[in-house]
A protein has these predicted regions:
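Radical SAM enzyme [4Fe-4S]-AdoMet core and its adjacent flexible, acidic
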Residues: 41, 61, 75, 84-87, ...
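Conserved alpha-helical substructure of the radical SAM core
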Residues: 1-112, 121-125
Length: 207
C-alpha cells in the first residue's frame, strides 16, 4: 500500500517494530545475549520515533527482545500510540499480564497480544493467571508455543496443552486453532535468532 506525502510516494509497511525496552524479567535460553546497556525508551523518545514513522504504518509492535510490560511508563507509551491513531500489538511472556490488566483494558487500540508460553519461568499459577487475564481482555490473543523440536513437543508444552484443551473444551490442538472468539494458538519449531555466526543461514531471506 502506498500513500503520498508532499507529492512523494511513500511505501507503507504492514507493521513496524519498536523496542521500547531491552530489559526482560526472564533469561530464556532461546533468546540471544546482548551487550547493549539495559534501558527503556522514554515517552519523549518514543513520541519522536512515532512522529518520524507516522506515515509509514498503521500497526506498531512494541517488542523486539525486551519485555514491554516491564516498562515503567507503559500507560504513557500507549497514550502516545492513541494520539497517533496507531493499532498496537504486544508480545509478552505473560508474567506481568495480570498485574498490567488495569492499564491494558483502558486502550481500545490494542489490536493483538501475543503470549509466549514457551518462556522459561517458575511463577506460581503462571498459566492459570494468564487464562483468567485473557478472559478480561478484548484484543486478539495468540498463545504461542514456539518450542517444538522437529515438530515434537517437550513435556512442559504437553502439560500446558492439556490444560488449554480442558479449559477451552477441545479434543485436539493444532497450529492456528481458534480456541474461542478472538483467541488462537500458535505452534512452531524453536526460533533461532539470525546471525552470521550461525552454522547455517539462508542465502535468501525476507525483511
Amino acid at each position: 500500500m502506498d500513500t503520498k506525502l508532499n507529492d512523494k510516494k511513500i511505501v507503507k509497511f504492514k507493521r513496524i517494530y519498536i523496542e521500547i525496552t531491552n530489559v526482560c524479567n526472564l533469561n530464556c535460553s532461546f533468546c540471544s545475549n546482548s551487550n547493549k546497556v539495559k534501558r527503556e525508551m522514554t515517552p519523549e523518545e518514543f513520541k519522536e520515533v512515532l512522529s518520524k514513522i507516522n506515515n509509514y504504518t498503521d500497526y506498531i509492535y512494541l517488542h523486539v527482545k525486551g519485555e514491554p510490560l516491564t516498562h515503567h511508563n507503559l500507560d504513557k507509551i500507549l497514550d502516545i500510540t492513541k494520539e497517533y491513531n496507531k493499532k498496537v500489538c504486544i508480545t509478552t511472556n505473560g508474567v506481568f499480564l495480570k498485574d498490567k490488566l488495569p492499564i491494558l483494558k483502558k486502550y481500545d487500540n490494542i489490536y493483538q497480544i501475543n503470549i509466549s508460553l514457551h518462556s522459561e519461568n517458575n511463577k506460581k499459577n503462571y498459566l492459570e493467571d494468564i487464562i483468567s487475564s485473557v478472559n478480561e481482555l478484548s484484543p486478539y490473543i495468540s498463545y504461542r508455543f514456539w518450542t517444538l523440536d522437529n515438530n515434537k513437543m517437550d513435556n512442559k508444552t504437553k502439560e500446558y496443552i492439556k490444560i488449554l484443551k480442558k479449559v477451552y473444551n477441545k479434543e485436539e490442538i493444532y497450529d492456528g486453532i481458534k480456541l474461542k472468539d478472538k483467541v488462537y494458538l500458535s505452534l512452531d519449531n524453536k526460533f533461532t535468532w539470525p546471525s552470521i555466526n550461525n552454522n547455517y543461514y539462508n542465502e535468501r531471506g525476507t525483511c
